[in-house]
Amino acid sequence: MNLLLYLLLLVPWVLGSEDGCPAKCTCDKKGFTVDCSNAGLTRIPKGISSNVRSLVLRNNRIHTLIKSDLEGFPLLESLVLTHNKIKVVEENILDHLPELKRLSLSHNLLVYIPPLASESRPLASLNLKRNHIQFIDERWLLQYFPELVQIDLSHNRIQSLRTKLFENLPSLTHAHLHANPWNCDCRVTKVKALLRKVEWERKAYCTNPVELRHQAIDEVEESLLKCAKPEEESWTGDEFKLVCTKNASSSRPVVWLYENAEVDSSSLDGYEIHDSVITVPRKTNVNQMTCTYDYEHVPHHRRLRQSHHSNGAPQFTYKPRDNSYREGSEVKVNCEVMGTPKPSITWYHNGVRFASSRKKQLGLSNNVLRIYPFLEEDSGRYTCEAVNSLGKVSHTFSLDLISSIPPNIYEGPQSVSQNIGGEVVFVCKAKGNPTPDYTWSFDGSTIGHIKGRFMVSDDGTELXISNIEKKDEGYYSCMAGNPVGAMSADAKLTVIGGETRKSSTPQIDEELLRAIAQKARQNVESAVEKTRKQLNQDKITNTNDLKRLFRFSTPKQAVELSKAREIYEESVRLVREHVEKGLILNVDELHPNNVSYESVLHVTHVQALMGLSGCHTGQFKNPCTDTCFHNKYRSFDGQCNNKNKPMNGVSLMPLRRLLKPVYENGFNTPVGWEKGKLYNGYPMPNVREVSRQLVATETITPHRKLSSMVMQWGQFVDHDLTHTVTALSRHSYATGAFCNRTCDNLDPCFNIPLSPSDPRVISESAKYPCIEFERSAAVCGSGETSLVFNRVTYREQMNALTSFLDASNVYGSNEVQAQELRDTYNNNGQLRYDITSAAGKEYLPFEKDSNMDCRRNFSEENPIRCFLAGDLRANEQLALAATHTIFVREHNRIAKKLKKMNGNWDGEVIYHETRKIIGAMMQHITFKHWLPVVFGGQEQMDKFVGKYQGYDPAIDSSVTNAFATAAFRFGHTIINPTLFRLGNDFMSIKQGHIALHKAFFTPELVLTEGGIDPLLRGLFASPLKHPMPTQLLNMELIEKLFMKGHEVSLDLAVMNIQRSRDHGLPSYTEYRQFCNLPVPARWEDMKGYIKDDMIIQKLRGLYGVPQNIDLWVGGIVEEKLENGLFGPTFACIIGEQFRKMRDGDRFWYEKDGVFTPEQMKEIKKVTLARLLCDNGDEIDRIQKDVFMYPGKEKENYGRCEDTEMMDLKAWSKCCDDVCPTMLDRILRSRHRGSRLHGCNQNGLWRPEGAKWIPPNEYCTEEAVFGAPPKKTVLTTEVHSSQRNSVLY
């Protein structure tokens, strides 16, 4: 909540019915303040009083801001347009607002900022945070704002700012520039100087170049902020031609500077730019010319002056320029036109019209031309022509070919002998165009620029090794590579003295290398020629042909000359082209090691190929050498749990398969990708129709025995075990279109079409006729990226979490995340928090620019930040956030007691011992209390999970794809449509219960509507939804899922079914066969597993045959186990997962030696009821088993003092043997504080950004909701120069 909203709260309101107050707006009596927030407006409304001083238009759908909408407001001082969809702002928009002092355009879609005024204006505060801004031109933006005090450009896409942007701003005291991908070259020197003069909220960090990444701009040495001096290539007559040698890749656009100001070829006479070459007048002082490059292409908005355009003939808004590209590269050209009626665009190459094809693809209404690969025959003159009924325009430009030369090493490293303790320098120099990059490796392992005693020079040409040891003896390889090839050279280091180092792998001498190369040439040259002919003639008909092509795209000279880039591009192109043509790959032939490069390519060169491609296998491998620590405690990412196979169960690794995947092409495309394809004679049904006809229910039946806590604990456990990583982009890789604006299957978009009879289409609530869906990200090494792992494999998906039940949802799945959650101010081993409840108990800390999933429901009036937790989904719904809060409180409660009992323990020991106890609590509650309930009894659980027989290191605990994507999602069938909120009297609180869709991503309601107690009581004192086959998912999940965050609300059933197809899960019947269950061949056979004939008829109408039923659908409709919540198929998959998760965990709480017998005795006392009693604010009544529902009357619930409590005395002086490395961990812990995002004034809570009056008040105290302030956590002085500046 910002200053404007706070001020508005101070005055009386009347509804918008009088003159000067538009409909849907609220105004004060004099019309000075007008609030049109949340009104669904698409433009500024008419009828606003000319006396208006403050105009608030937050949370609307305004997409264009034009001057005519702002005429007639001569007294307007504050304009708030946050949370709209503004993409276009007309030039000089403030010319009609002579008194405007505050302008907020945050949380919009702006990419380019035009000139805002043509004459001086008294603007004091400008907020542009959280847009998509990539370019700001100082010549217009800030030229007329001498009174500007504050500017916020944070959370945009700005790489650099022009050098004069902040000149002539004498009043500027606050500039927020963080959360931008800064390119730290000479262009940020002015930014650095500015940051030293003004105040800022958070530091701005470099993103590029790599060697400066994560360094704060204001702390970088100025000598490192470099631009390159160009080389003089030639001069003719009155012109110089200069070449920027810094640009090593055509994918990085060159930026030219003259006298430290960027050169713009569209506005400076006499300059001509072609890629990395600039032609300048001879009178130019070339000593003042420098160059650098952007790391991502800055779009055409960089030099576009946007304006409002009415009906008329076509007019170019962006014209493509002449350019040059390297052979084999991808070319993307934008030609953008506006006009009404909408113009049609036609393309010509050398005067000949062409249509979209695989080689030359046209997208986005023909606005975008893509050419891949760009070859000599593609060069020439291109014309973009736009026509409508009112006229025609055309523009012609050239695309030229740049010659490329593969690297040639002219000075290679020489073998050398050196004494122990000495120093050696290997030199490697190569020529090529583009300039080669260098990669050094030692016995197959890549050497970083600085790695211990190894150091690579800045240009990569030298490798220096100091203080040589015997283990450094071996072969060193230098590979020089550019986009068109690579070459390598090897040298041997012999270390004199000490014992002879035994090589782990046999070494190949020069004679053997020559023999291998000769044989390889004989075998490969003829095979390559043959396969190229097959490629040209489209004769690839089976997997073996494809495998031969993969192998023979390797280089002719296997040792001396390795064209790594050619291998990669040729192979990927081959996969893409022939899979697109319909090639079917047999899974049995593809997995696991059937297409190896190693027979013709040295392992060091394979390593180099992987490095150059940028593709790595998830986690960096921990050597697990810290045996003291790893014997006592878990790592955060799961590594070193299994000493024999340390990557088992680790985060950021592929999900495990129970059955081979089913992809339409056998490789990577999901079932349903190709429209109309038949399976067993029938097309697969539209998943939305399955949801509507079979899964959705408007009525629910309460469970007679179980409480809603069963559902909530299941979700909490799931978020400790599984989180499938989805595609990073919402844009189609092929066309660049947003996934929510296309219904075509274009990676990563796999959207679900809506039928004409769909209620969303009929009601016109769907802006686009499909539900948005992005595919899960593929693990590098599968699908398209598999080639750099020396084999072709089918697509696999990644689990971002550890597969162990280890409380990673409390502590995080990596060490960086864990440090974010710790209180490192005090050496007390506690978790961090920012505010407390009225009972003095901690709430979750607020996130601060983290990766928490927080699609905020910003229609609410209390926009606090989201909570931070070990799992990024903690804000997903209110009851989940309350459960997370319980465990933060329990950790800190235990940590305080351990500290009191063991005064000699430091914070690191307290933290890890407490974390170990919390993990054991989760394991005990899950296996002893929760799993027997969902399986329908201990006997059923023992049948499917089995009893614990001890740790088995041969077991892989990794989560299975079927478990994460289908089986464990049975929990969606037991979710109530309402979150109950009950007070101490077990009646509804005054704010009432809350519909589920209103509980999504609304963490502010935890703080403002009763805290966590009502939510927790609503879980253990309300009945679970019964998962009846005819009542599966409630309508809150089918029609209103995350409806505030999406233009088309999601459908959870649709997500589940589509995700299982995306992951290639086989059908329901195949998993029944895997589980040794009877497999239905006909619909009549289904009656043994599904009792309701109507459900069988619906399945038959949707799927045609039983063999087509999706796993999740079949699993939720089959007959349940007696007293259980799922049927035998899901019981098989879930039981297998929990059994392996337990038996393959070296730190399982029941394993001998993990806890002492005395400690185990106490852990067995743990119940979730006790945790709720200890950590709720005022929970004093509860049933002993919170998963059972005793009824709604208060008398059915016993007192907390009657529940058994764990005695922590068993941990007194238990763990004094501290590992030495734990002291290092304390020192490495990042010292971070907790900033409160708000303040307290006269006992009243003021949210972040609110202005307080009278002047000189300070934000000094923590706000304790529902009680007076408790402690001082923040002091913020308000200087006189700040009082008129506002943070929105």
From Swiss-Prot:
Ca(2+) binds at residues 720, 802, 804, 806, 808. GO terms for biological process: hydrogen peroxide catabolic process; response to oxidative stress. Its main location: secreted. Disulfide bonds join 335-384, 428-478, 624-640, 739-749, 743-770, 1075-1132, 1173-1200. It holds the Pfam family LRR_8. Heme b binds at residues 718, 876, 972. CDD domains: peroxidasin_like. It comes from the Eukaryota. Residues 1-16 form the signal peptide. Glycans are attached at residues 247, 594, 740, 857. LRR repeats lie at residues 27-49, 50-72, 73-96, 97-120, 122-143, 145-168, 204-227, 356-381, 387-412, 998-1022, 1049-1073, 1168-1189. Catalyzes the two-electron oxidation of bromide by hydrogen peroxide and generates hypobromite as a reactive intermediate which mediates the formation of sulfilimine cross-links between methionine and hydroxylysine residues within an uncross-linked collagen IV NC1 hexamer. Plays a role in the attachment of tissues and in axonal guidance during early developmental stages. May functionally antagonize the peroxidasin pxn-2 to maintain neuronal development. Belongs to the peroxidase family. XPO subfamily. This is Peroxidasin homolog. The gene is pxn-1.
